[in-house]
A protein has these predicted regions:
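Surface-exposed assembly/interface segments
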Residues: 1-233
């Protein structure tokens, strides 16, 4: 894991951990939050909380058209706090690749994967970048933090080595910065995304879809009891 610089309110905890790691190679970290903390999302109106992977697995079915809730943005910051407001996610299919600002991050344009082609599907591939739009994470505005190449909009997609290549699953299992919550609202022009590959022509929008994350809020100061709860986990 990577940790930022100590703040006035968190200096004691930060420096205690830093000192411990000078003579130890491993440390358990618990992030205790108050109800004030919110994850940044690509929605301008709805904020939410996703505490960790276990919590995500519990609540992810509540997002998207199938649940009736498309108000939460398609992209959600992986952790609560204002730092997530520095993030931007972009997703691009074949039609928009030539004019995409981030095409140089990838070897070639996305298209139709071998998996989808073998099943009569088309245009399932997309490229995704996660960008430090404001420079608050990396220290440099516009730094590309993560790239996901040739991932598929098909829910059953497999890569050549047999591993899961469904874009949402790839992002949610390996990104350090964002969750991909659903394909509705923000990403609705990527039609049929999230369905099986067989016979499916996936949406191929003419330009990359860019979404900045907002609404992230830091935790309020912890009480002694809340700190103790963290130690009990």
């Amino acid at each position: 894991e990577k940790f930022g610089s100590p703040t006035i309110t968190g200096a004691v905890d930060f420096l205690s951990a830093a000192q411990f790691l000078r003579y130890s190679s491993a440390m358990f970290v618990v992030r205790e939050l108050t109800s004030a903390a919110k994850n940044a999302t690509s929605s301008s109106t709805v904020v939410t909380n996703v505490n960790n992977k276990d919590h995500w697995d519990e609540i992810k079915s509540a997002f998207g058209a199938d649940s009736g809730d498309t108000n939460v943005g398609a992209w959600i910051g992986k952790w609560a706090g204002a730092l997530g407001n520095s993030l931007k996610a972009e997703i691009c299919t074949a039609a928009g690749f030539a004019a995409w600002a981030y095409k140089g991050e990838f070897d070639a344009a996305p298209g139709t994967s071998a998996y989808a082609s073998a099943r009569g599907g088309s245009n399932d591939e997309c490229h995704i970048v996660v960008v430090d739009e404001d420079g608050e994470i990396s220290g440099t505005v516009g730094t590309v933090l993560e790239r996901f190449a040739f991932v598929s909009m098909a829910s059953d997609a497999k890569a050549a080595d047999g591993t899961n290549n469904y874009a949402a699953d790839v992002v949610n299992s390996s990104s350090e910065y964002v969750w991909l919550a659903h394909w509705d609202g923000d990403l609705s022009t990527m039609s049929n995304a999230g369905t099986a590959a067989s016979g499916t022509a996936f949406g191929n929008p003419s330009a990359a879809i860019t979404k900045s994350l907002t609404g992230g809020v830091d935790s309020a100061a912890l009480t002694t009891a809340e700190v103790a709860t963290g130690f009990d986990l």
